[in-house]
Amino acid sequence: MKMEVKGFERKVLTPTFICLWLIMFLIEVVKSALLVTILPVYMGSVLGLSAFAIGVSLSLQYIGDNFFRSPAGWLVERVGFRLTMLAGLVLSLGAVALIAWGERSLIIGLGCTLLGVGTAPLWPCVLMGITEMTEGKQNFGTAMGIIQMSTLGGTGVGPVVINLFIRRSYEGVFWILLGCLAVALLLAMLLPGVKLERGRKEEALKKPSVSAGGLRKLGANLKQTFTEIRNNLQVSRLLYPALFLQSFAIGLLTPIITLYIRTVLMLSPAMFSVLLVTGGAVTVLGLIPIGKLADKYGTRLFLNTGFLLAFLSILGLALFRDMTAVWILVICIGASYAFILPTWDTMIAKQLPEGEKGTVWGFFLTIQGCGMVVGPVISGKLWDLFGPSAPFLVSAGSMGALLLIHLWISRPGRRTHQGPAIRQKTGGRPLNDRSGPKARLR
């Protein structure tokens, strides 16, 4: 059964998609509430732990989330969405419980690590699900626009809602987070298991399962999986630094943006909140329209526009202090990410081989996530050594480099070398990363 939404040219919302959307929203609420609002204050003011312990705990969450995405993607291919997400959410429930009732930094650090590992399957599951549901329908960009709305919405709602309850009792706040995860767990039970398309049953039957041959054969199965990926995933080598730079540019600004607004621009917390809401609203309003246009006309123009706009806007924040200019730049940054968010993953989806899509998604997400791990570390050093503008200049430079890389790898007429599975799928013609029904396989 599928639901039609007025204004959508194609059927996008399915029960599976809606479940993934709600799970994404709830998990982002929990993560943003914990990492932004609760842990820094709870660990410092209530438990009396050091700033170093707080920083390490937050880093452990990012590391667990990032480096377990590839295994999670591999697991989705073999046991399906339901079991993968259920395992991750059960682990997340246990992690939040450890954080809530653990009073030592070691226990809280363990909880943060488990939370990262538990939420790692989320993006591979979502992207794999969208890839499967939109295959042949040319509406991946539209679907990504809707999913990104849940991500941004959950990230914004979490800290705001939790702030309403945090003054009464931290215990009550933790129960709210556990309740959100419990609802997500119930929704995960509605996800499909291993779904095999008719045309791919033979290929899937040949694919090694998690338990095929017992644990002693697991290493051989993994080796076979990565051999298949190496033979069939033939993309431009420049795609890998592009994946890193896309998140590195954001990671550079994440730890210092609040400090910059308060100490350099001298704005109040209320005005800072208004700026964030304004930029976020511009992004959210543009996600679905840009996603639909990318489905129709391809991703190249929209990504180039987004990267150029982000480069100029972030550079402007480093150079200008006038409030009128700051407002314009914030709106432009919001618009740039409305161009980038739904179209970036759409472009990546066109690079996937026929088999092992979940594993490849996890691999790409791990590379991309490294930028969010490295960026904050470098950002602080840049601030201390070269001043407040330095992180913005490096972030703008990263966006500029990303624009140049994308101009090169997406240029018209570019020929790529593909593995046997892709050559068979395209009749021997190289695959161009421009999507949309009007784009052709070159």
For each predicted feature, which ranges?
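Juxtamembrane intracellular "pre-TM" segments in multi-pass secondary transporters
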Residues: K2-T14, K195-Y240, R423-K438
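Helix-loop boundary and gating motifs at the non-cytosolic
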Residues: V12-Y62, V235-L238, A242, S247-L265
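Residue-level signature of mid-helix packing/kink "hotspots" within the transmembrane helices
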Residues: Y62-S70, T155-G156, G280-I288, M372-V373
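Helix-to-loop junctions at the C-terminal end of transmembrane segments
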Residues: F67-G80, I166, L287-G298, W383-D384
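Structural signature of the two symmetry-related core transmembrane helices
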Residues: L83-A97, L301-G316
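Paired small-residue
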Residues: A95, L106-L114, T324-C332
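Cytoplasmic helix-loop-helix junction between adjacent transmembrane helices
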Residues: T113-T151, M347
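Symmetry-related core transmembrane helices of the 12-TM Major Facilitator Superfamily/SLC fold
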Residues: V173-L190, F392-L407
